[in-house]
């Protein structure tokens, strides 16, 4: 079914890895680190430049503001920078590994042109794919899939994922025709936006994903083995 496409654009959460990974692993890891980051912040600390962009001097208020952004899942670019910094430490220390589905790992390895589009920052995307839990190895082993991925897009590079113009921007940047691209996501609003510029779409139906009311109008993929 995917043989007609030369280029693949992939969402992350709910598509190539469990949707629970962000809310049950990444977000708690970050929120647990926030008090320490804020209270120990000094002018020469690594996160000082990021925290200063919130323009909140009171540390208690700053901490509350950051945690509120996380709780409401606000796509704030400053928050994304801070999360990227914290998650980098987690990945590099071995405390975090991304549970990418085995069929998605195989898919990324065997397809010639694969791009990633996520609301998470490009930096966070590269970290995730750089520290993937190897399904065929002991728990401490990880895979680096970045060499198999041709490019990364986020809300800063391309725009919001629910806006058609964002996909037009991506087509321009990768130099592809809409008819050559298949976009896979668990979010129907994103699929509709991509379809608005003529990109073919597929609905990722993974364990734990929310039911899609009009799911029958999309080509549904429970895994990527058929692609």
From Swiss-Prot:
It comes from Saccharomyces cerevisiae (strain YJM789). GO terms for biological process: L-methionine salvage from methylthioadenosine. Binds 1 Mg(2+) ion per subunit. PANTHER family: ENOLASE-PHOSPHATASE E1. Its cofactor is Mg(2+). One of its GO terms (cellular component) is nucleus. It catalyses: 5-methylsulfanyl-2,3-dioxopentyl phosphate + H2O = 1,2-dihydroxy-5-(methylsulfanyl)pent-1-en-3-one + phosphate. The keyword Metal-binding applies. Its EC number is 3.1.3.77. GO terms for molecular function: acireductone synthase activity; magnesium ion binding. Its main location: cytoplasm. SUPFAM superfamilies: HAD-like. The lineage of its organism: Eukaryota, Fungi, Dikarya, Ascomycota, Saccharomycotina. Transmembrane segments: none annotated. It is an enzyme of class 3 (hydrolase). Monomer. This is Enolase-phosphatase E1.
């Amino acid at each position: 079914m995917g043989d007609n496409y030369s280029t693949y654009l992939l969402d992350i959460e709910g598509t190539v890895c469990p949707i629970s990974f962000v809310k049950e692993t990444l977000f708690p890891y970050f929120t647990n680190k926030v008090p320490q980051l804020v209270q120990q912040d000094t002018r020469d600390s690594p996160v000082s430049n990021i925290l200063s962009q919130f323009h909140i001097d009171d540390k208690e208020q700053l901490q509350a503001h950051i945690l509120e952004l996380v709780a409401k899942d606000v796509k704030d670019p400053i928050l994304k920078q801070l999360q990227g910094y914290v998650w980098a430490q987690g990945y590099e220390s071995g405390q975090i590994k991304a549970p990418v589905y085995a069929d998605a790992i195989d898919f990324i390895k065997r397809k010639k042109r694969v791009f990633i589009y996520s609301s998470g920052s490009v930096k966070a995307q590269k970290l995730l794919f750089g520290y993937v839990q190897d399904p065929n190895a002991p728990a401490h082993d990880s895979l680096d899939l970045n060499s198999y991925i041709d490019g990364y897009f986020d809300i800063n590079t391309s725009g919001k994922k629910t806006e058609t113009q964002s996909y037009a921007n991506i087509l321009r940047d990768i130099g592809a025709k809409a008819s050559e691209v298949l976009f896979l996501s668990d979010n129907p609003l994103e699929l509709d936006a991509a379809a608005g510029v003529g990109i073919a779409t597929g609905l990722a139906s993974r364990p734990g994903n929310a039911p899609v009311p009009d799911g029958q109008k999309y080509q549904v993929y429970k895994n990527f083995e058929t692609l």
